[in-house]
């Protein structure tokens, strides 16, 4: 998945999560989240769905952030 890291980090902050708290909320460790945000590993489909759920993303936000889709 081609994640828009900048937008994802923005949504994490907008929802008042620290990276550690967000990682725990989606069921991973902070180092694992860090690797995914750096592009060293990819989010699985299940992890991506959990991100959407925890951040309460709309379909458009999900597509833009987690799939790198430009809907404009």
Which role fits each region the language model picked out?
Residues 1-17:
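A short, Lys/Arg-rich alpha-helix, primarily the initiator
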Residues 10, 35, 64:
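DNA-binding alpha-helical recognition surfaces that contact promoter or target DNA
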Residues 40-52:
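Short, basic-rich loop-to-helix N-cap that marks the start of a DNA-contacting helix
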